[in-house]
C-alpha cells in the first residue's frame, strides 16, 4: 500500500507489524539499528572535526586494515543491538560471531562501515545489515549458515550529502531520509521499482587485466556503445561504496558488478555473502530487480563460513540476465567465439 511521503520509519515499522505480527522483534531490531545510524551519521558529518577517522589500526577478520571510523561504527551498532531482541551478531569487524542475549529470537549480520577507503576524503560510506531468525542449537554460527531467503529484513544506510535508511521487511523496498530538524527518518521513496533496463553499469575498471573473458566481453561490448552489439551507449559509475551504487540502481536502474577474478584471494570476489551480498540481494529483489553470483540467485546461496565471499551482479533484470548470457555462451560478442565452459562469475 502506498504510504504518504514524509511518514516516519517508526510509522512504517508499526504498519509492517500490524500486517504481520511475527515481525515485531524484527521491527524492534531495525529501530535499534536506525538509532545507531543517526549517531554514526553525526560522526561522519563532522568529518575531521571528529578526529582522524581514517587513522589505521589493526586488521579485521578479512585482513583489511581497520580505520578509526570502522571501530567507532562497530562499537555503536553493537551497543544498539545489545538492547534489541538479538542473540547473535556476525560483523565484518569481528573474527567470530558475538553472542548477545541467549534465547533471543534473531541474528544480525552487519558491515558497520561500508566503503572504508572513502573515509577521510569526504566521499560516501555506509552500513549494511541482514536480519535472520536464530537457528536453535549450541553452534552460534548456525543461524548464519542458512540461505539468504531466511532473512526477515535487510537494509543499508548511506552517509552522504543526505543520510538515507533503505529497508525491506519482505514487503517492498523503501528509502527513508534523515530529517535533521528532528533526527527522524522520513519516507522519501515508497515501494521502489527498478526499471527493467538502463544504460549504466558500475564496476571497478582498474581490475580489467584480472577479469575472466565473460566480464571483459560484457564491458567491451558496453564500451562499444551504439556501434557495437548492444546498440546503445552506456555510462560507467563507481563510488567504492556498495551502498551508494545500490541506492543509485534502486532509483534509476542499471547494473553493478563485482566479479571474481584471477588475483590471489579474489577468486570468489571481494564482497562478503552474509553482510553484503545477501542483504543487498534481498533489497534489490524486493524492488523488482535481479541479483546473482553468476551461477545462480544470491539469496539461494548458503554460506559455509561467516566471512565467506561471493561475486555479485545486481540491478535491472534485463541487464543482469544479459551478463549471465556472456557466461553460458548465449551472448558471444561480435568477432569472438562463444565462451564455452564459463559458467559463472566464480572461478574454480
Curated annotation (Swiss-Prot):
Positions contributing to substrate binding: 114-117, 204
Residues annotated to bind Mg(2+) 1: 92, 111, 113
Single Gene Ontology BP annotation: gluconeogenesis
Entries under InterPro entries matching the protein: FBPase_C_dom, FBPase_class-1, FBPase_N, FBPtase, Fructose_bisphosphatase_AS
Keywords: Carbohydrate metabolism, Cytoplasm, Hydrolase, Magnesium, Metal-binding
Pfam families: FBPase (PF00316), FBPase_C (PF18913)
Protein name: Fructose-1,6-bisphosphatase class 1
Source organism of the structure: Methylorubrum extorquens (strain PA1)
Species classification: Bacteria, Pseudomonadati, Pseudomonadota, Alphaproteobacteria, Hyphomicrobiales
Amino acid at each position: 500500500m502506498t504510504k504518504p511521503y514524509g511518514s516516519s520509519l517508526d510509522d512504517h515499522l508499526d504498519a509492517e507489524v500490524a500486517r504481520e505480527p511475527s515481525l515485531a522483534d524484527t521491527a524492534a531490531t531495525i529501530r535499534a539499528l536506525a538509532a545507531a545510524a543517526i549517531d554514526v551519521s553525526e560522526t561522519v558529518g563532522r568529518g575531521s572535526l571528529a578526529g582522524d577517522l581514517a587513522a589505521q589500526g589493526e586488521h579485521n577478520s578479512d585482513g583489511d586494515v581497520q580505520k578509526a571510523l570502522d571501530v567507532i561504527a562497530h562499537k555503536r551498532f553493537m551497543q544498539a543491538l545489545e538492547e534489541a531482541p538479538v542473540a547473535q551478531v556476525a560483523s565484518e569487524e569481528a573474527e567470530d560471531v558475538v553472542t548477545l542475549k541467549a534465547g533471543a529470537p534473531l541474528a544480525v549480520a552487519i558491515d558497520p562501515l561500508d566503503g572504508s577507503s572513502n573515509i577521510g576524503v569526504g566521499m560516501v560510506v555506509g552500513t549494511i545489515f541482514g536480519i535472520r531468525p536464530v537457528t536453535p542449537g549450541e553452534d552460534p554460527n548456525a543461524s548464519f549458515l542458512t540461505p539468504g531467503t531466511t532473512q526477515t529484513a535487510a537494509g543499508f544506510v548511506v552517509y552522504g550529502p543526505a543520510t538515507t535508511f533503505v529497508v525491506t521487511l519482505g514487503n517492498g523496498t523503501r528509502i527513508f531520509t534523515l530529517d535533521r530538524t528532528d533526527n527522524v527518518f522520513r519516507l522519501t521513496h515508497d515501494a521502489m521499482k527498478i526499471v527493467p533496463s538502463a544504460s549504466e553499469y558500475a564496476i571497478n575498471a582498474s581490475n580489467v587485466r584480472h577479469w575472466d573473458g565473460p566480464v571483459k566481453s560484457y564491458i567491451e561490448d558496453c564500451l562499444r556503445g551504439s556501434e557495437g552489439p548492444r546498440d546503445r551507449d552506456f555510462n560507467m559509475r563507481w563510488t567504492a561504496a556498495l551502498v551508494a551504487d545500490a541506492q543509485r540502481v534502486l532509483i534509476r536502474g542499471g547494473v553493478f558488478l563485482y566479479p571474481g577474478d584471477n588475483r590471489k584471494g579474489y577468486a570468489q570476489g571481494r564482497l562478503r555473502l552474509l553482510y553484503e551480498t545477501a542483504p543487498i540481494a534481498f533489497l534489490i529483489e524486493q524492488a523488482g530487480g535481479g541479483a546473482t553470483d553468476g551461477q545462480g540467485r544470491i539469496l539461494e546461496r548458503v554460506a559455509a563460513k561467516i566471512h565467506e565471499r561471493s561475486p555479485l551482479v545486481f540491478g535491472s533484470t534485463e541487464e543482469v540476465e544479459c551478463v549471465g548470457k556472456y557466461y553460458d555462451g548465449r551472448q558471444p560478442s561480435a568477432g569472438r567465439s562463444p565462451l564455452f565452459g564459463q559458467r559463472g562469475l566464480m572461478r574454480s
